[in-house]
Amino acid sequence: MNTDRITAFIKNGISARMPFYDTLPDMDLVFGKNHLPSLEYGANYFLQLSKINDINRLSTEMLSLYTHDLNKESDISKLFEPYNIKTIKSYGRSIQADAVVVDLRPSNSLYKNEHPYYKSNNYLKENNLYICDYTMITFEIYRPIFELSTEKTCIIKVPTLFGKTIVNAVRVYCSLFRYVKLYKLSADSWLKDSAIIVCQQPHAANINKFITYIRKVTKSQTWLDSNNVNFILIHDSVERVFIEKFLSFSYKIYESLYYVHSLLYSSMTSDLQSLDNEYQKKLIKLLRG
């Protein structure tokens, strides 16, 4: 494991400009379902899962103790100056601003529910962490499109890069906007696989086509909060070159997270049974600088 490379990723952040596609992929919207992870969309899921299960098994009280002050996220605002954004809005089509900014993180916490230490993975019923959970991507990821009025920039903080659904969602955005760039900034939490999508230069015809299709399927002219659920929009695989471009970005993040999570787990299970151990010191140095 190249720790110097990982340290550089965390200290400097990572970004990737995504390709523009003039044509939207074939769409067939189904609510209440989602894609299961597949090797085609990245083997990192299966590698990461072992480490996530290890951390899931430890008590949430201990997790909070060992990650105190290491999970801060202050990344979104860092992009305002580079993109000349002075005013923002989230939801409200009648409001005008420089950008639509939507934060889809479910929580600032690392975990969903408190639980004690589990002796075995047999006790794990689900991923209790807000990390590497592909079910966190809901149809709300497309809501910013319905909030655009005069804005030319859209910024979306997504909670995970895991799975087929997020890859497909970014692919759709790459036809709705001519400029799409992915970021994992140093100011983000490097305990999580969250990231930011920045979109500019709207493609009006494709946006109108997309909105018309969604309104037809949902039988509503306005956004319905009841649609903020798991979904499948694209059933076929998107372009292989696009998948590889996305994975070249996300792999660097998961490589870094694997190292971070390894340090965290080693610290939490250290024989010293104290925060004052070599793994925790490395973790603090890496994440706090």
From Swiss-Prot:
The cross-references to Pfam families, in alphabetical order and at most eight, read: Pox_mRNA-cap (PF03341)
- Going by the entry's taxonomy, the superkingdom of the source organism is recorded as Viruses
- Top-level enzyme category: transferase
For this UniProt record, give its keywords in alphabetical order, as a comma-separated list.
Methyltransferase, mRNA capping, mRNA processing, S-adenosyl-L-methionine, Transferase, Virion
Q: What is its main location?
A: virion
Keyword flag S-adenosyl-L-methionine: yes
Q: What is its EC number?
A: 2.1.1.56
Question: Cellular location of this protein?
Answer: Virion
Q: Which Gene3D superfamilies match?
A: Poxvirus mRNA capping enzyme, small subunit (3.40.50.11680)
Catalysed conversion reaction: a 5'-end (5'-triphosphoguanosine)-ribonucleoside in mRNA + S-adenosyl-L-methionine = a 5'-end (N(7)-methyl 5'-triphosphoguanosine)-ribonucleoside in mRNA + S-adenosyl-L-homocysteine
Role summary: Catalyzes the last reaction in the mRNA cap formation pathway.
Q: How does it assemble?
A: Heterodimer of a large and a small subunit.
According to UniProt, the name of this protein is mRNA-capping enzyme small subunit
Q: Which organism is it from?
A: Fowlpox virus (strain NVSL)
